[in-house]
UniProtKB/Swiss-Prot annotation:
It comes from Arabidopsis thaliana. Glycans are attached at residues 65, 96, 132, 153, 171, 235, 250, 283, 318, 363, 519. This is Receptor-like protein 20. One of its GO terms (cellular component) is plasma membrane. PANTHER family: LEUCINE-RICH REPEAT-CONTAINING N-TERMINAL PLANT-TYPE DOMAIN-CONTAINING PROTEIN, RECEPTOR-LIKE PROTEIN 12 ISOFORM X1. Belongs to the RLP family. It is a single-pass type I membrane protein.
Length: 671
């Protein structure tokens, strides 16, 4: 075989999926092992075996972990079969190894080639060899350091079966030549520009140029590609569309992701087939177009962080994910949620909404996330929402809510799936019953990993791309106001701060094992800090400042290994601050305003003499134990003595009653 130049690829791992020509049972597994021989070869055709062996020998395996299959070459029939590859074809994925480009000459049936991060050096010798891969359909060269220009005579443009091409995150210096149009079977391409040559790619289904610095306007011709169903341009600097706002209407696009750009002006009219539209973090203005109500397949509408005005749309009942957060919307939340509504997320926080919560929300049996924080809603606590069986997040903070938050019967609150309840900065009053947190079954379970509230799947022949739309809330956490994402099943949090609540803090708070943040500050709570807080092993943030709490700080809090923030300042607490790393490492301000508190991190010492508080505590315990032992000794002597005394008296009374008369006297005996 003719030897070509030896410019190398440095690869993370190499996996070779080989389908031998005999039958599905003839798939092979080849692994690098200590003695450098093969294991598991099965009925492979001789020329296939020779090609595979030669390809394996191109690699430097001296630094491989030979016990790890992914540091070698392997073949997996299940993966080949699941990809529906035709017999006689091969798929290769390369990373962090060294291979001469001549290797690819032997694989005329290669259909998939991937060389991804960590970055590879410039590889001018790779492209000439590509013309030998006549059946190649997938080529992923993303996240490398390829440089230079793509010349018109590049063998890349001879891959007429190519359907998937990814060249993103490289250092190519040229624009795409017109020869790019020869790839007329291309369906998916990730680049850093919108080349005009794309006009000729009539089979293009998905374009993803996200996370780049592309500016300007989206070309009008893009929407005329007949099979295009996904456009992802998030995290760029686009500022508008060529043509009118009606340019998208007749497009076949189903998923349109415009988030985090510089778009201005009115929202575009959406395609009739749209499933998901995300345009958050832009500068869109005007009202939400009425045409949205005619897009019956719309499942995701994400318009957060814009400057939209006007009312909330009347037709959102069957949109699964609705995020209108941080706009300038006015009016009331419409009473138009119908029975059987499919809405799962409704976030209208940080607007100018007034009125009351719509009672038609009771029709939304799938509702999991409801956020109306930072508006001007004036209403009582929505106990009626307990009828929603899946409600997990409820945020009412910074509105004009008022009245009690305990049910009239003073029992448990009654939201079994609730994990996050934020009602801070309102005018809620009254006390919490001792059983208030008993029915929070979801928060009483241990933490689970969040898998995304609403996901859109974009399927293609090369895998499944998942776009996840996360819920976000503003939570005062560890003393800071922070925007939290991944909120649903990943943790539990309670924020009752800045209200007019009073009475004792219920011991039932200790049942919420998934609780990571508890904020009861700026109320009028009295009584002791619940000892049951020591049961909250996941707790990371605890704020009970500016109340009227008394007594001591529970010693069990020092055992909470995740507790990163605690504040009990400005109460009426006394005694020694528990001495544990998580507590003594806090700022002094977390404990100030309690005249009776002493010990680190405060400067006030708890004792005047040289003995430490711990030593005094031990001495007190020893004295108590000594007294208990003395009483035990007395009891041990008293019990048997009393028994013997009764026995002697019984014998005397039975057999010698005159002796008993002499001992106690006749008068005493008559009594």
């Amino acid at each position: 075989m003719k030897t070509m130049s030896k410019s190398s690829l440095r690869l993370h791992f190499l996996s070779l999926l080989l389908l031998c020509c005999v039958s599905p049972s003839s798939f092979v597994i080849i692994r690098f092992i200590t003695h450098n021989h093969f294991d598991g070869l099965v009925r492979c055709h001789p020329h296939k075996f020779q090609a595979l062996t030669q390809f394996k020998n191109e690699f430097d395996t001296r630094r491989c972990n030979h016990s790890n299959y992914f540091n070698g070459i392997w073949c997996d029939n299940s993966k080949v079969r699941s990809q529906s590859y035709d017999y006689g074809t091969v798929s290769v994925e390369l990373s962090n190894q060294t291979v001469a480009s001549s290797s690819f000459i032997i694989f005329a049936t290669l259909i998939s080639l991937t060389t991804t991060s960590p970055p590879l050096p410039s590889l001018p010798s790779l492209f000439p060899t590509l013309r030998n891969l006549t059946k190649l359909t997938v080529l992923d060269l993303s996240h490398n350091h390829f440089s230079g220009t793509l010349k018109p005579n590049n063998s890349l443009f001879e891959l007429h079966h190519l359907r998937y091409l990814n060249l993103e995150v490289n250092n190519f210096s040229s624009s795409l030549p017109s020869e790019f149009g020869y790839l007329n079977n291309l369906q998916h391409c990730g680049l850093k520009e919108f080349p005009n040559i794309f006009k000729t790619l009539k089979k293009m289904e998905a374009i993803d140029v996200s996370n780049n610095r592309i500016n300007g306007k989206i070309p009008e011709w893009l929407w005329s590609l007949p099979l295009l169903h996904l456009v992802n341009i998030l995290n760029n600097s686009f500022d508008g569309f060529e043509g009118s706002t009606e340019v998208l209407v007749n497009s076949s696009v189903r998923i349109l992701l415009l988030e985090s750009n510089n778009f201005e002006g009115a929202l575009p009219s959406l395609p009739h087939s749209i499933n998901a539209f995300s345009a958050g973090h832009n500068n869109f203005t005007g009202e939400i177009p009425l045409s949205i109500c005619t897009r019956t397949s719309l499942g995701v509408l994400d318009l957060n962080y814009n400057n939209l005005i006007g009312p909330v749309s009347q037709c959102l009942s069957n949109v699964t994910f609705v995020n209108l957060r941080k706009n300038n919307l006015e009016g009331t939340i419409p009473e138009t949620f119908i029975v059987g509504s499919s809405i799962r997320t409704l976030d209208v926080g940080y607007n100018r909404l007034t009125g009351k919560l719509p009672r038609s929300l009771l029709n939304c049996s799938s509702l999991e996330f409801l956020s109306v924080d930072n508006n001007r809603i004036k209403d009582t606590f929505p106990f009626w929402l307990k009828a929603l069986p899946k409600l997990q997040v409820l945020t009412l903070s910074s509105n004009k809510f008022y009245g009690p938050i305990s049910p009239p019967h003073q029992g448990p609150l009654g939201f079994p799936e609730l994990r996050i309840l934020e009602i801070s900065d309102n005018k809620f009053t009254g006390s919490l019953s001792s059983r208030y947190f008993e029915n929070w079954k979801a928060s009483s379970a241990m933490m689970n990993e969040y898998v995304g509230l609403y996901m859109v799947y974009e399927k293609n022949p090369y895998g499944v791309v998942v776009y996840t739309f996360l819920d976000r809330i503003d939570l005062k956490y560890k003393g800071l106001n922070m925007e939290q994402a991944r909120v649903l099943t990943s943790y539990s949090a309670i924020d009752f701060s800045r209200n007019l609540l009073e009475g004792n803090i219920p011991e039932s708070i200790g049942l919420l094992k998934a609780l990571i943040a508890l904020n009861l500050s700026n109320n009028a709570f009295t009584g002791h800090i619940p000892q049951s807080l020591a049961n909250l092993k996941e707790l990371q943030s605890l704020d009970m400042s500016r109340n009227q709490l008394s007594g001591t700080i529970p010693n069990g809090l020092k055992q909470l290994s995740f507790l990163a923030y605690i504040s009990v300042s400005h109460n009426q607490l006394k005694g020694e601050i528990p001495q544990g790393t998580q507590i003594t490492g806090q700022l002094k301000s977390s404990f100030e305003g309690n005249v009776g508190l002493c010990g680190l991190p405060l400067e006030e010492r708890c004792f005047d003499n040289s003995a430490s508080p711990t030593q005094h505590h031990k001495q007190d315990e020893e004295e108590e134990e000594e007294q208990v032992l003395h009483w035990k000794a007395v009891a041990m002597g008293y019990g048997p003595g009393l028994l013997v005394g009764f026995a002697i008296a019984y014998v005397i009374a039975s057999y010698k009653p005159e002796w008993l008369t002499k001992i106690i006297g006749p008068n005493k005996r008559r009594n």
